[in-house]
Amino acid sequence: MGRDLPIETADQRHTWLSGTLRRGFAWAGDLIVPPVCAACRGALSSHHTLCAACWRDVGFIRAPLCDRLGIPLPFDTGGPTVSAAALADPPDYDRARAATYFAGTAQRLVHGFKYSDRQELRVLLGAWMQAAGHDLLDDAHLIVPVPMNRRRLFWRTFNQAAILAHEIGRRTGLPVSVSALRRRRATMPQVGLTRAQRRVNMEGAFGVAKRKRHLIDGHNILLIDDVITTGATINACARVLLRAGAARVDVLTVAMVAGEVPLTP
């Protein structure tokens, strides 16, 4: 009898059965691992989200924004606007966007993701990044994460930027290359260095793999990292990608440190 069903009826039955199974598995999963707030771990009704109190503590970066640096502007001009800071000291990348400021709940989430191996946070953080970078994602051809120093990668066992890159790729269907950009050497901590010292510190730290150069040449690259701090790392990566022939390089992160972007001499 089942073989004689009209196609539409069979499809409807398959959709109903699939939905029922998904809901059943979700219900069973919630019994085993009840949903909690991603930040404070308080009880919630669904996974991968925040309670009201933690949500209010997130400093989302909202428009109007400087088209280059992604920092808030005092008023909306009705179109793309470049801040005085970006005009005075243009970044090497084309545009940067961050979902939040690196403080409060957002800082706790990023630290949990990076240092406590809470890789499930990629879902929530990826959703924030997708919303913040929708205009960059529309123009991107390839997603490239900021690479990690081999020694640090050995001890941490994962590159948080690569995990975020794959999450954004999963959400958008854009291709991801974790090996196109390589870390050639370790660098000194950037804290306390002037802009000139930061640039020297990062020079030669990154390179494009020869066998991946064809993925970069002539394409719009979306560079992914977790946090923009001093901006020196993403600028160094952008310079290398542009030298390899990238048509443009945009930057998308979870957060930025307030007061650190733009760079100051």
Per-segment meaning from a language model:
Residues 1-225, 229-265:
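Glycine-rich phosphate/pyrophosphate-handling loop used in enzymes and phosphotransfer proteins
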